[in-house]
């Protein structure tokens, strides 16, 4: 297959989510367990990114704007636990969406301090959805897992974690290569929204085949199958996520609750008076096949497309060069 250059594709936002929160409580949530003990749960890294960093990037400033016909309220309406339970139970999902204090804390993170971030991510999610759903459907993975990149990367294809995971789905180099993603000096397919989505769907399918439970598969996606197996062993062989929960790595304990919260907020943002941002990105993609090296500068000069826009739409190319000649294929 010849190399592909995506000139315009609505789904490909590139924002650098680099600014982190200022205080310790921005990195963790505190709950009380069944024994009355204080429990500190790490917040996924993408949930600590500042919305101002997102909105100051080239693509956000060029193609996103607040909707003049809808204003996000400054405060979040209050709801009872039963209302949250009822809403989660109405979602037409295969993956269980239980409600508890931990899930509620993560919902509050999105609907209270993260209101502007949610408005941004809804706009981005509307555009990424076709890519995610097609990849998940190909491997028989429940479509609700399309919201996993909300937790993983904040929907930033160029996001890089402190551990070196990259892209929308936050692949490490080793796992990315195992699932066919090229990582070299010129190309990082972990940042390619399409290729990484298919790789993630295949990985999730494999993890479900191992554990037979979507919560455990999600935990393994975050911390690896070995850590989940160790937690199962320490929990006496139980394969219930909430039973093995205390034995999982600290950073993984908040992962499934954050995923449930992301599914909730992406479906019920209106009830919380959160307005999506308005996107002026084109709805169609134009693909050009190349079989030789072409620089972004050459493409920009020929097509009149700013280099910054080419970078934003093609985050997988690391040196502003589409390397069509390095790995020619049919």
Predicted regions and their residues:
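Bacterial Sec-dependent N-terminal signal peptides
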Residues: 1-26
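An acidic, Gly/Ser/Thr/Pro-rich helix-cap/linker signature
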Residues: 20-139
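Extracytoplasmic/secreted proteins, especially bacterial periplasmic and envelope-associated proteins
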Residues: 102-105, 120, 124-127, 131, ...
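Substrate-binding clefts and substrate-entry loops adjacent to catalytic sites
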Residues: 106-120, 154-162, 170-212, 232-246, ...
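Short, functionally critical alpha-helical segments immediately adjacent to catalytic or ligand/cofactor-binding
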Residues: 141-159, 217-224, 310-314
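Extracellular LysM carbohydrate-binding repeats and other cell-envelope/extracellular binding modules
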Residues: 248, 313-330
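Catalytic cores of secreted or luminal carbohydrate-active enzymes
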Residues: 250-271, 327-329
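Primarily a LysM-type cell-wall glycan-binding module
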Residues: 277-304
